[in-house]
Design a protein with these regions (language model features):
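Structural signal for interior beta-strand "rungs" in well-ordered beta-sheet cores
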Residues: 2-199
Length: 199
């Protein structure tokens, strides 16, 4: 059966699939669809050795009107998903993520914490969007794109000052299997060819 915790707000016309879990305080707009086994509004539980510190409290997850959450997707508390969005099957959206309106986040995509995604963005199957990435409006992110945020790969304290994800400016297109190294900026309307490594 479906689990709906205390303080959840479901807009008119919402539908919930089998075994969906809606955590406390989560807010869904009108006519949202939540597919089977999706989990909405869960709290992050980092490993004891994690260097990413989670705030002691997070605001509830908010999802706009007519958005769809796929089967097995997990969307954390503290995030905002706009109207008319699609979060694909088996996709993970971490805490403190802001997703604009009319965004497609495809199947099996990971969006890490503190990411900003503008209106009209399309992120295709299997992409990895690392923490602290910004994707401006109307960008296209092809399948299996990988973004990174730590040039030191977990070594030395310098990484804490210098880590940061890519900034992908308005209307840019990033081809399949592209790898973007930390702190890269892709210009407005730029095109990055498939398989490129941008350093």
């Amino acid at each position: 059966g479906v689990v709906i915790e205390q303080g959840v707000r479901l807009g008119p016309g919402c539908s919930l699939g089998h075994h969906a879990v809606i955590h406390a305080g989560t807010q869904l707009g009108a006519a949202c669809r939540v597919e089977d086994h999706a989990v909405l509004g869960r709290l992050p539980r980092p490993a004891p050795t994690s260097t990413v510190k989670v705030p002691p409290t997070l605001p509830p997850l908010r999802i706009g009107d007519r958005s769809s959450i796929g089967t097995g997707a997990v969307v954390y508390a503290g995030s905002v998903v706009g109207s008319q969005c699609l979060i694909g099957d088996l996709t993970f959206v971490r805490e403190q993520v802001h997703i604009g309106d009319r965004v497609i986040v495809g199947t099996h995509v990971t969006v890490e914490n503190e990411v900003s995604i503008g209106n009209g963005v399309k992120i295709q199957t299997g992409a990895y969007i690392t923490a602290w990435t910004t994707i401006e409006e109307n960008c296209f992110i092809a399948p299996c794109v990988v973004t990174t945020n730590d040039n030191y790969m977990g070594r030395t304290d310098r990484r804490f000052k210098e880590r940061g994800g890519a900034v992908i400016r308005r209307g840019a297109r990033v081809g399949a299997n592209v790898t973007l190294l930390p702190n890269i900026e892709i210009g407005a309307e730029a095109f990055v060819a498939a398989g490129a490594v941008v350093t």
